[in-house]
């Protein structure tokens, strides 16, 4: 796996799924391929994106700044600086300075990532802030190692939280989660349908599922009543995709 592929993988792991994630993935690919060289426009676009947390925006802004060639005097962006200040916690800043001293002696991506993984996400973000504000300089490879370690820490905590939700025994949360997943699967079917011959069938199935979810939410149902809803919808989606010759990997 190339360095930039690895960076893209880690960064996208902390972006919530949805159309915005696809858009960000495209922007990252363009930046890494040298196709997008307007850092100012890129940062303005990033700043106004909804849904993303300030920290995720800060990390993306840091990656764009590292990758896109720009004039030396280009102004640093406040939204990135605020996100990478470690919540203003002096402990984070102390640890960030210690980490920075170690990273300065490092030259490889993997070496930097290994060192950085021993620190908290707050300290890692603060260290990124030091580099972003030009208070410290490391090689691009080392900076990318720091980015990936930060994303790994964040993704780990997101995964723990997600696992808690998936394994929860609370029937109301499970029921709502199944209905949300059914709705997003329906949306995926509608997006994939496009103008194909089977489009009408896919749209019909998706539309029925949405109506069912809306009805269940409006009248209230027993928490076990949604158990088969998502599975039925996924089965229909798989059958539809097989006929269309589309690979299932992306939807597993």
From Swiss-Prot:
Membrane topology recorded in Swiss-Prot or TrEMBL: Peripheral membrane protein
Region Membrane-binding, residue ranges: 1-164
GO cellular component: host cell nucleus; membrane; virion membrane
SMART domains: Flu_M1_C
HAMAP family reported in the protein's UniProt record: INFV_M1
Miscellaneous note of the record: Most abundant protein in virion. When expressed alone can form virus-like particles in transfected cells.
Compartments where located: Virion membrane; Host nucleus
Keyword annotations from UniProtKB, A to Z: Host nucleus, Membrane, RNA-binding, Viral matrix protein, Virion
Gene3D superfamilies referenced in this protein's UniProt entry, alphabetically: 1.10.10.180, 1.20.91.10
Subunit structure: Homodimer and homomultimer. Interacts with NEP. Binds ribonucleocapsid by both interacting with genomic RNA and NP protein. May interact with HA and NA. Cannot bind NP without genomic RNA.
Listed GO MF terms: RNA binding; structural constituent of virion
InterPro entries: Flu_matrix_M1 (IPR036039), Flu_matrix_M1_C (IPR013188), Flu_matrix_M1_N (IPR001561), Flu_matrix_M1_N_sub1 (IPR015423), Flu_matrix_M1_N_sub2 (IPR015799), INFV_M1 (IPR037533)
Short motif (Nuclear localization signal): ranges: 101-105
Region (RNP-binding): 165-252
Keyword field contains Acyltransferase: no
GO biological process: viral budding from plasma membrane
Keyword Membrane listed: yes
Role of this protein: Plays critical roles in virus replication, from virus entry and uncoating to assembly and budding of the virus particle. M1 binding to ribonucleocapsids (RNPs) in nucleus seems to inhibit viral transcription. Interaction of viral NEP with M1-RNP is thought to promote nuclear export of the complex, which is targeted to the virion assembly site at the apical plasma membrane in polarized epithelial cells. Interactions with NA and HA may bring M1, a non-raft-associated protein, into lipid rafts. Forms a continuous shell on the inner side of the lipid bilayer in virion, where it binds the RNP. Determines the virion's shape: spherical or filamentous. Clinical isolates of influenza are characterized by the presence of significant proportion of filamentous virions, whereas after multiple passage on eggs or cell culture, virions have only spherical morphology. Filamentous virions are thought to be important to infect neighboring cells, and spherical virions more suited to spread through aerosol between hosts organisms.
Name listed for the protein in its UniProt record: Matrix protein 1
Similarity comment: Belongs to the influenza viruses Matrix protein M1 family.
